[in-house]
From Swiss-Prot:
Lineage, top ranks: Bacteria, Pseudomonadati, Pseudomonadota, Betaproteobacteria, Neisseriales
Family: Belongs to the IspF family.
Source species: Neisseria meningitidis serogroup B (strain ATCC BAA-335 / MC58)
HAMAP family documented for this protein: IspF (MF_00107)
Entry EC no(s): 4.6.1.12
Record's protein name: 2-C-methyl-D-erythritol 2,4-cyclodiphosphate synthase
Known partners and oligomeric status: Homotrimer.
Keywords of this entry: Isoprene biosynthesis, Lyase, Metal-binding
């Protein structure tokens, strides 16, 4: 049995009026928010998928289905912590998390330190082990037209 595993996660949500924009557990001032059953935090959903995938535990939808009433407007930090408990129960510990958020607007740089701190706290790892990169799509495609925000994540796990 291998003692290290890597997981990859991805999520995208449509931007819409009348919703809060939450990324990495941080409410970001913006005229639109992400549409989804939960708080639609695409960054935390990608991290959650990466963790579950690395541990061989499926994906976020199999653990927290968007058809279940108990997850309506759920805080994605709560979902991340619950998923990570399942990962730890299988004997795995997160080593590091590397993510990319693609959003034409708003600028994410001012919010990245708090996003990193939230993920580090939720996983019980040092903030130096969490990286978040904000990118635009150079005005190309649906992301460039500000129709949505996309997030990608990679997670390294080690056997406890």
């Amino acid at each position: 049995m291998t003692n290290i595993r890597i997981g990859q996660g991805y999520d995208v949500h449509q931007l819409t009026e009348g919703r809060k924009l939450i990324l990495g557990g941080v409410e970001i001032p913006f005229e639109k928010g992400l549409l989804g059953h939960s708080d639609a935090d695409a960054l935390l959903h990608a991290v959650t998928d990466a963790l579950l995938g690395a541990a061989g535990l499926g994906d976020i939808g199999s653990h927290f289905p968007d058809t279940a009433a108990e997850f309506k407007d759920a805080d994605s930090r709560v979902l991340l912590r619950a998923a990570y408990q399942s990962v730890q129960a299988q004997g795995w510990q997160a080593v590091n998390v590397d993510t990319t958020v693609i959003a034409q607007k708003p600028k994410l740089a001012p919010h990245i330190p708090q996003m990193r701190a939230n993920i580090a706290a939720d996983l019980g790892i040092d903030i130096s082990c969490v990286n978040i990169k904000g990118k635009t799509n150079e005005k190309l495609g649906y992301l460039g037209r500000m129709e949505g925000i996309e997030a990608q994540a990679a997670v390294l796990l080690v056997r406890i």
